[in-house]
């Protein structure tokens, strides 16, 4: 009897986990009318918070462009020796490292603490702290990151970041607030496990009012007889009674109150005191790190091949073949040698999707990293199955976007530090200025697909000559030239144009 019961329990657990993972994928539909965009604008951050060891800048999530795409975006600058406090959010995040290097920890619930201190490390602890009951430190895996990395953070999973380099870390993060993993609302929310941070997406004036209101409530509670003391901080422990926390952690009440960070004014990025942050981690050179990344990708390809074989054999994929605790969360798309598309005189494009980074199947997000050389052109194209949020990394580009009515909804310059949302199916073209143009695009599909309008792999090339000639009312010779004159597929070298310079002059006058 025991075996059938155990089998039944196992099947129930597999079905439950499979259902949970299935629920985490997919996106909610935006409210009706939110994508009726008559004009797009290249946006700068609208909110800025200065912390002890860095700066947090965010774009207004209520802007119609972000409401259409169902996303929120924040840019963080972490100074050397700066620590972004542990936090989790109500929506999955995809983060791109613009500059710098550092380490991060992602805290999956129930996963073992596989990084632990040695006896030698314990001997370095001050004698006053050593005792028979003293525990060696151990924690979950530490991951290194560097410029060009895409990092995936699932919804509700806590994480932290630390800058162990000599230059600031600049990171841009997109939160997919319409993902089914978010069952609250479309407002981006960060839940901190420490400190007294501000709401990154709320204007400063509103934050000051909210902080004043919390302080008044805190003072009123202190004056009420029999009222348990609660902190006035802004992390998840602040609202609990200190006595409850003391019981939960088995510590004294004073230590429990420190969790509430009542008088901490450092905000969400703090400076590590003294020397660098001391955590348990392997010391790798860049070459060793890249070698380990290649091994991880090879293991994932083997796992993916096994999954395909199991599905052909009639077995369902329950999402557990790659253990959650060992998920690879990072992929570098900034390295030129990693390019998926390359044209010698025009530029390159690299992508991260669920084929190259399987965790993105869970997040339902992907990313594109592009570089256009001076005056090069990314041919007109559209995204078949995703919105695209473009962040300009370096340089400038002339960008045009056209909607389903054939109306130009954006015809302007996109500069370093700006964001532009390109809705699904809207056609777009980019042309770099003299200094070139580099960007990263966050896309709201695990395998975002692009369809070019010109070039060797374009929709126009795929049409029969007769169809093209009759549709455009042109001779077949002209139709043939439209189909075959451009042999490149995606990135092309642009030819000089007097009309382009005159258009730029008119825009400058406006």
From Swiss-Prot:
Quaternary organization: Homohexamer. Can assemble in other multimeric configurations.
Domain of life per record: Eukaryota
GO biological process, one term: seed maturation
SUPFAM superfamilies per UniProt: RmlC-like cupins
Motif (NGXEET): 318-323
Residues in Cupin type-1 domain copies: 38-257, 331-480
Tissue-wise expression: Expressed in endosperm of the seed.
Paired cysteines (S-S): 35-68, 111-325
Gene Ontology molecular function: IgE binding; nutrient reservoir activity
The name this protein goes by in its record: 11S globulin
Amino acid composition bias (Basic and acidic residues), ranges on this chain: 284-318
Segment forming the signal sequence: 1-23
Keyword Disulfide bond found: yes
Family: Belongs to the 11S seed storage protein (globulins) family.
PTM annotation, UniProt: Proteolytically processed from a single precursor to produce an acidic and a basic chain that are linked by a disulfide bond.
InterPro entries: 11S_seedstore_CS, 11S_seedstore_pln, Cupin_1, RmlC-like_jellyroll, RmlC_Cupin_sf, Seed_Storage-Functional
């Amino acid at each position: 009897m025991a075996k059938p019961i155990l089998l039944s329990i196992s099947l129930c657990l597999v079905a439950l986990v499979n259902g949970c993972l299935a629920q985490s994928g997919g996106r909610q539909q935006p409210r009706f009318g939110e994508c009726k965009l008559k004009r797009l604008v290249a946006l700068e951050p609208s909110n800025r918070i200065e912390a002890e060891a860095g700066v947090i800048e965010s774009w207004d999530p209520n802007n119609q462009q972000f409401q259409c795409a169902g996303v929120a975006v924040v840019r963080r600058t972490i100074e050397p020796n700066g620590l972004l406090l542990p936090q989790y959010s109500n929506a999955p995040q995809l983060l791109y490292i613009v500059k710098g290097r550092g380490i991060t920890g992602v805290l999956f619930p129930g996963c073992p603490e596989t990084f632990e201190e040695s006896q030698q490390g314990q001997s370095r602890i001050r004698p006053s702290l050593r005792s028979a009951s003293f525990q060696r430190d151990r924690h979950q895996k530490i991951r290194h990151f560097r410029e060009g990395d895409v990092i995936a953070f699932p919804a509700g999973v806590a994480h932290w970041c630390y800058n162990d380099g000599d230059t600031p870390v600049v990171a841009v993060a997109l939160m997919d607030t319409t993902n089914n993993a978010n069952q609250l609302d479309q407002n981006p929310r960060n839940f901190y496990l420490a400190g007294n941070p501000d709401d990154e997406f709320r204007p400063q004036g509103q934050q000051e009012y909210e902080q004043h209101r919390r302080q008044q409530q805190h003072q009123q509670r202190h004056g009420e007889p029999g009222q348990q003391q609660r902190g006035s901080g802004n992390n998840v422990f602040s609202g609990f009674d200190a006595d409850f926390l003391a019981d939960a952690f088995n510590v004294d009440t004073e230590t429990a109150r420190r969790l509430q960070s009542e008088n901490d004014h450092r905000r969400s990025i703090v400076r590590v005191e003294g020397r660098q942050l001391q955590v348990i981690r392997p010391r790798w050179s860049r070459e060793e790190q890249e070698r380990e990344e290649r091994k991880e990708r090879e293991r994932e390809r083997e796992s993916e091949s096994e999954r395909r074989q199991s599905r052909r054999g009639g077995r369902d994929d329950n999402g557990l073949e790659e253990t959650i605790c060992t998920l690879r969360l990072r992929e570098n798309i900034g390295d030129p040698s990693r390019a998926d598309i390359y044209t010698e005189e025009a530029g390159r494009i690299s992508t991260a999707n669920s084929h190259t980074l399987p965790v993105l199947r869970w997040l339902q997000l992907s990313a594109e990293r592009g570089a256009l050389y001076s005056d090069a052109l990314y041919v007109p194209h559209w995204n078949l199955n995703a919105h695209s949020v473009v962040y300009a990394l370096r340089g400038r580009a002339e960008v045009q976007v056209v909607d389903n009515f054939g109306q130009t909804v954006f015809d302007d310059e996109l500069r370093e530090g700006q964001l532009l949302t390109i809705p699904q199916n809207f056609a777009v073209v980019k042309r770099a200025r003299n200094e070139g143009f580099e960007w990263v695009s966050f896309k709201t599909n695990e395998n975002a697909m692009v369809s070019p309008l010109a070039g060797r792999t374009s929709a126009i090339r795929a049409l029969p000559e007769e169809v093209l000639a009759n549709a455009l009312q042109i001779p077949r010779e002209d139709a043939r030239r439209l189909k075959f004159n451009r042999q490149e597929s995606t990135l092309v070298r642009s030819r000089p144009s007097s009309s382009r310079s005159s258009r730029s002059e008119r825009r400058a006058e406006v």
